[in-house]
Amino acid sequence: MNDILDQIMAAKRAEVAAAQKRVPLAAVRADAESRVLTRDFEGALRAKISQGQAAVIAEIKKASPSKGLLRADFIAADIAQSYAEGDAGVSAACLSVLTDQAFFQGSIDYLKQARASCQLPVLRKDFLLDPYQVYEARAMGADAILLIAACLDDAQLADFEAIARSLDMAVLLEVHDRPELERALARCKTPLVGINNRNLRSFEVSLSTTLDMLADMPPERLPVTESGILTPQDVKTLRDAGVQAFLVGEAFMRAADPGLALARLFA
């Protein structure tokens, strides 16, 4: 079945091959390894939790395959500043920036602009299928990467995490079901485990995905619920179940003031 994820992965492989012809792996790796002082992504999440607040990874996303254009008035730096400022003492812990251009209208430049405009740690949100992209993430300034279990085999999960760690980047490990969770936990050491409520093959969303998987999460891991968190009731339902970390994008991208929308959602 040629589902959405298959289409994205096929396009991404071609994109990476083209990128390596323009800038060889050796050059990207050298650039990545020359960079110092990543921002503490995990630490920023845990700091919010220690204050009794929700730890929010606020996403900067112009469009998506399922919803189309989310924000026409899109200035990554302004959105990042809005998230960092928040309102009434409620603000983002970290940022997630889409760098996939073909399906999400993202850009490496958006990540650079967002990171330069504030002090928050930044996650590169993309479909990483090749070690080249891990080095590329650090070279562009990312403090963390997303590894999607549905896109990677066991060896890749372990290898990509090891590369990220060698570059002092955090890893957010994304799963959607129990088999993915079991496989990923066996291969990766990162404490940050994202539970995506969106099925990447059908793009259907259900918060019960997170609720059903919490019991399977080892205590040393920090679950991050992702996708479909749109209302204060959604937040309450998840927090009542013990969820402390959230990745949210769409609800904020449609708002005139993303930071204010964040503060209201997590008030």
Curated annotation (Swiss-Prot):
Instruction: Give the CDD domains listed for this entry.
Output: IGPS
User: Does the keyword field hold Amino-acid biosynthesis?
Assistant: yes
Q: Which organism is it from?
A: Verminephrobacter eiseniae (strain EF01-2)
Q: In which pathway does it act?
A: Amino-acid biosynthesis; L-tryptophan biosynthesis; L-tryptophan from chorismate: step 4/5
Under catalytic activity, the entry for this protein gives:
1-(2-carboxyphenylamino)-1-deoxy-D-ribulose 5-phosphate + H(+) = (1S,2R)-1-C-(indol-3-yl)glycerol 3-phosphate + CO2 + H2O
Provide the E.C. number(s) assigned to this enzyme: 4.1.1.48
Protein name, please? Answer: Indole-3-glycerol phosphate synthase
Class of the enzyme per the UniProt entry, highest EC level: lyase
Q: Name one GO molecular function term.
A: phosphoribosylanthranilate isomerase activity
Q: Which gene encodes it?
A: trpC
What family is reported? Belongs to the TrpC family.
- What keywords were assigned to this record? Amino-acid biosynthesis, Aromatic amino acid biosynthesis, Decarboxylase, Lyase, Tryptophan biosynthesis
Q: Name one Pfam family in it.
A: IGPS
Q: Name one GO biological process term.
A: L-tryptophan biosynthetic process
